[in-house]
């Protein structure tokens, strides 16, 4: 694993998910930006000193050369490092699992696509919400044609944790790098949670977005990246959609909600009740 040391939000999530079925074992890591703390970080994860690395480049080279080396790496760093780490790992013959977004810019995404094709290795991107059973059931309902031809898709992802400029406090690591264009990339809220919204829309509907009209705003004064996003969508086939992503929705925690409407009815799923899927039929009782 690259990243995921003390203070990381997503690193421990990757670790727990990897160990659920006992088929994956973390054998090496470069967990900290501070080289002086890398051994302690590795020890906290139960790694021997020789498999804890001060630098991700050193780790990739060493693990690729070992007969018992890592088979793939998980990238849990800020966004600006996603491409360089993935590029070097793929070139060294390692498979890659990366936290979203894949890259910080569109140009980097194109380069990553070419790197993956040339390497012959697998590349996975962790859009976690598509793993919920009810999200997969929603996709199957749409695929069967139960709703009829799709007409409209609405997705909303609201958080309130950035309603204040906490990135300036100096003691909120997660907010600090997400508000820094040099580390987060060109998109703030849209790159952090808007990508989840976009992913679940295409995953469930089976449609592809063909055009967008986007209003990206920085609501908190002085913030350098967008923290509120309102996007009109057009899909192939003519369906319409709306994507709302906000991190200044004061009081909201992690409110991802998806609604899909067809000729015969619509379905409604919310992350706050992930085991519940509601189908509202035009000419039949709600299920």
For the regions a protein language model found, what residue spans apply to each?
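Redox-cofactor binding/interface segments in oxidoreductases and associated redox assembly factors
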Residues: 31, 74-75, 98, 155
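Contiguous beta-strand/loop segments that form the cofactor/metal-binding neighborhood of enzyme cores
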Residues: 164, 173, 192, 196-285
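Beta-strand-loop-alpha-helix segment that lines the small-molecule cofactor/substrate pocket
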Residues: 72, 78-131, 145
């Amino acid at each position: 694993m690259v990243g995921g040391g003390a203070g990381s939000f997503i690193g421990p999530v990757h670790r727990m998910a990897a160990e659920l079925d006992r088929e994956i074992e973390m054998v090496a890591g470069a967990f900290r930006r501070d080289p002086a703390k890398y051994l302690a970080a590795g020890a906290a994860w139960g790694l021997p000193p020789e498999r804890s690395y001060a630098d991700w480049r050193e780790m990739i080279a060493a693990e690729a050369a070992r007969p018992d080396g890592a088979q793939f790496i998980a990238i849990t760093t800020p966004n600006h490092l996603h491409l360089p780490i993935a590029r070097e790992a793929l070139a060294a013959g390692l498979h890659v699992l990366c936290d979203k977004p894949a890259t910080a810019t569109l140009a980097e995404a194109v380069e990553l696509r070419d790197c993956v094709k040339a390497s012959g290795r697998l590349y996975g991107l962790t859009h976690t919400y598509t793993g919920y059973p009810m999200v997969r059931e929603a996709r199957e309902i749409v695929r069967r044609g139960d709703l009829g031809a799709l007409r409209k898709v609405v997705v909303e992802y609201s958080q309130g944790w950035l309603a204040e400029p906490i990135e300036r406090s100096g003691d909120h690591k997660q907010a600090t790098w997400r508000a820094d264009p040099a580390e987060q990339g060109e998109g703030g809220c849209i790159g952090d949670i808007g990508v989840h919204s976009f992913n679940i829309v295409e995953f469930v509907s089976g449609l592809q977005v063909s055009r967008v009209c986007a209003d990206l705003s920085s609501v908190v004064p002085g913030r350098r990246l967008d923290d509120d996003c309102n996007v009109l969508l057009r899909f192939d086939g003519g369906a319409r959609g709306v994507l709302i992503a906000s991190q200044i929705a004061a009081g909201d925690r992690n409110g991802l909600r998806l609604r899909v409407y067809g000729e015969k009815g619509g379905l409604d799923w919310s992350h706050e009740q992930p085991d519940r899927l509601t189908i509202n039929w035009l000419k039949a009782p709600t299920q």
